[in-house]
Amino acid sequence: MRIQTDAVNVVSRASSYLLSGLLKRKPLWFDVVAKYPPKQNLIKVPYIQSKENKDPRNDQFELKKRDRKRPLSALYQTRASKMENGNLNRKIHRIPKLKFLEDEIRDYFHLRHPWENARPKTLVENSGDEVLRKCDWSRMLQLYKPLDGESVVQRTMYILQNDPEVKDVFEAYDIARFEYYKLRMAEEMESHVAKEESVMHGAVFESTHLDWNLTTEQKYIDDWVKIASEKTQVLEANRSKSNAPAGSMGGEEVEAAQVSIFEVFCKLVHQRELKVSKERRSRVQQKTHEETSRALYIIEMKMKRILEK
C-alpha cells in the first residue's frame, strides 16, 4: 500500500489553494497547524549509498551470535524456539482465583478445630449475609447467630480493622480464639449444672439412640456367648470320650473346661486387634502430624503474602 502524504502536506496545499483563489476563506485550523506542524515525515526518501552510510537491510542477512554455529540453511527462523515458547504467558486470559483473608482464617481455624464441623448448622439461607448484617462484632456472643467458627472469623476481622493496637492477624486471631474458648467453657458448665439440678429435682433422661443400640447389641452377644459355651462343652466331652483308653466304659466324668474355645478365640482376636491398632495409630499420627505441619506452614505463608500486599 502506498504511503499517504496528503495529511503531511495539508498546510502547503491549503496555502497554494488560497493563493490560487480556490479557497476564499482561510480555514480555522490553518494557523495552528502552520505553527505546530507534524513532526513525523512519512515521505519515503530514496536511499543513497555512500561509504559513511550503512545499509540497515544488510542486518537481516547477518547471523546472530546464537546462530553462528548453525549451517547456512538455518538463516531464517520459521518457528518459535523452546525458549521463546517458554516465555509466553499462557495464563493471561484465565480468570484469577478470588482470595480473601476470611477464607484463610476460616481454613486455619477448622484445621486446628476439626470437631467444630460436627456441630449442627443451618444451611437454609437467602443471600448468605443477612444474619451477619444484624450482628455487632464488637463482642463475640451474638443474638441472631449461634457461637461457632464463623464467629471467630468475623471477630478477628473486626479486631484487625478497628483496634489500632493490634496490627498482626495472628494476634487478632488469638484474642478472638480465647474469647471463643471462654464462651464454650461457660456453655458446657451451664449445661452440666442444669442437668445436675434437673436430676436433683427428679428428672429422668431417656437413653440416646446410640446407647439403646449398644445395649440391644450386648444382649444378643450375651445370649450367643451362652450358646457357644454350651456347644464347646459338648465338643470337649465328645473329644474326651473318643480319646478314652481301651477297656474303659467311657462313662467317666469329665471336668468342664473352665475357659471355652470362644473366650480363648476372643482373647486372641482382641490381642491381635490391639497390636494392629497400635501400629496403625502410630502411622496415622505420624502422617497426620506431617500433613498438619505442612498445611499450617502453607497457610502461614499465604497469610503473610496477603498482609504484605
Curated annotation (Swiss-Prot):
Endpoints of the signal sequence: none
The protein's name in its UniProt record: Small ribosomal subunit protein mS23
Molecular-function GO terms, alphabetical: structural constituent of ribosome
Compartments (UniProt record): Mitochondrion
GO cellular component: mitochondrial small ribosomal subunit
Regions crossing the membrane: none
Similarity annotation: Belongs to the mitochondrion-specific ribosomal protein mS23 family.
InterPro entries (alphabetical): Ribosomal_mS23_fun
Quaternary structure annotation from Swiss-Prot or TrEMBL: Component of the mitochondrial small ribosomal subunit.
Main localisation: mitochondrion
Classification via Pfam families: MRP-S25 (PF13741)
Keyword Mitochondrion belongs to the record: yes
Superkingdom field: Eukaryota
This protein's UniProt keywords: Mitochondrion, Ribonucleoprotein, Ribosomal protein
